[in-house]
């Protein structure tokens, strides 16, 4: 071999060696995921109980798992309670808070609508629904509900406050919305 052939063959050999090394290093990690009796990649689901007790999981991940499992169980319990007692405003409001925290306001509105069918003049349910409508940016509908609730109880400071906030969010300031105290 002359020196010209060595200059061409050395980089070519190095390139081939790199490709082989890359292929081997790519396949080895995948081989660790496959089982011998089944050559495809194996996926094994781990139960929530096993995850909660696992020592390899760091504390932050364990907290997220606990929160997710707890929220799901709490939501199921509240929904079951509402199925048995459709007019349970306390359970509806707790479920509504959980759904809004999970960024599911449409479901929260459905829960409150179902409660309002059973107890149409409940101030807490009307207020909760109006608050969610405000969160969604539907201020006119929210203000209508606040006014409806204020007709039932004109002295309720929470309803007055929430109506003022709704008007402020919308950029309005109406004095006619507030009933005059005598």
From Swiss-Prot:
Q: Does the keyword DNA damage apply?
A: no
Q: How does it sit in the membrane?
A: Single-pass membrane protein
Name where the TPR repeats lie.
89-122, 123-156
SUPFAM superfamilies listed in its UniProt record? TPR-like (SSF48452)
Q: Membrane-spanning regions, if any?
A: 17-34
InterPro entries for this protein: TPR-like_helical_dom_sf, TPR_rpt, Ycf3/AcsC/BcsC/TPR_MFPF
Q: Which Pfam families match?
A: TPR_19
PROSITE patterns this protein is in?
A: TPR, TPR_REGION
Keywords from UniProt, A to Z, are: Membrane, Plasmid, Repeat, TPR repeat, Transmembrane, Transmembrane helix
The cellular location(s) given in this protein's UniProt record come to: Membrane
Supply one GO CC term from the record: membrane
Gene3D superfamilies (UniProt xref): Tetratricopeptide repeat domain
Protein name according to UniProt: Uncharacterized protein y4yS
Q: Which organism is it from?
A: Sinorhizobium fredii (strain NBRC 101917 / NGR234)
């Amino acid at each position: 071999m002359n020196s010209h052939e060595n200059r061409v063959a050395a980089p070519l050999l190095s390139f081939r060696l790199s490709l082989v090394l890359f292929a081997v290093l790519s396949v080895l990690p995948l081989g660790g995921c496959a089982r011998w009796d089944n050559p495809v990649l194996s996926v094994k689901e781990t139960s929530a109980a096993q995850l909660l007790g696992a020592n390899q999981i760091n504390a932050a991940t364990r907290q997220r798992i606990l929160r997710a499992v707890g929220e799901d169980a709490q939501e199921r319990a509240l929904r079951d309670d509402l199925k048995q007692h459709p007019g349970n405003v306390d359970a509806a409001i707790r479920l509504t808070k959980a759904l809004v925290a999970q960024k599911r306001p449409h479901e929260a509105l459905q829960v409150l609508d179902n409660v309002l069918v059973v107890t149409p003049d409940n101030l807490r349910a009307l207020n909760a629904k109006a608050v969610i409508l405000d969160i969604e940016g539907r201020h006119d509908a929210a203000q209508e509900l606040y006014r409806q609730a204020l007709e039932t109880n004109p002295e309720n400071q929470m309803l007055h406050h929430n109506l003022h906030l709704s008007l402020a969010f919308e950029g309005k300031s109406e004095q006619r919305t507030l009933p005059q105290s005598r």
